[in-house]
């Protein structure tokens, strides 16, 4: 571990005293994510969900929604999910892994993948530029291709994935409108290798 747990606890106390909504997120690749969050009041607010990241793209490449659903069931199931009630940081790509558009066999699968990112349990995040569907792969040990300078005006006019920016905006609007999409319970409804239906629900709202 890079950070001492006592240090994280002191950092949480001091930052919260300075600014109540100061948010602490950690990058954790392996191990028990819950260790770094604890009860949610004394350590970090969230950590990266690398386990889900892998399934989101490989489950589509392999036509295997069972992989994604198994991860979510293990992590967030109503009856015994090991991270139930915790808010993990969900992502499809970041500064250390290949861009989603470069990992997919079928680029159109970015549409359902971003829907899952926004509505499965977790805090959805978008790595800069990926909202346009740009590509990027590591070259050996060089991460520079993952972290390019971007011409936003050009990308807004001609995004590589034409439908993706508007789709992500729609997903964001729905998530903002419905609290159940953010904090509701997760319930699996139907699952085959190519079909996956689930609900997010609370006392007043439900989304399927």
Predicted regions and their residues:
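Active-site-proximal helices and loops of the catalytic beta/alpha 8
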Residues: 1-83, 107, 116, 133-170, ...
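Structural preference for beta-strand elements that scaffold enzyme active sites
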Residues: 21-25, 87-90, 124-125
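Acidic/polar loop patches that form or flank catalytic/metal-binding clefts of enzymes
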Residues: 25-26, 124-129, 179-185
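Active-site clefts of carbohydrate-active enzymes
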Residues: 82-105
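Hydrophobic, well-ordered secondary-structure elements that form the walls
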Residues: 95, 117, 129, 171, ...
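Conserved interdomain hinge at the start of the Helicase C-terminal
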Residues: 110-112
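Substrate-binding cleft of secreted/luminal carbohydrate-active enzymes
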Residues: 114-117, 121-135
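Carbohydrate-binding surface patches
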Residues: 173, 189-208
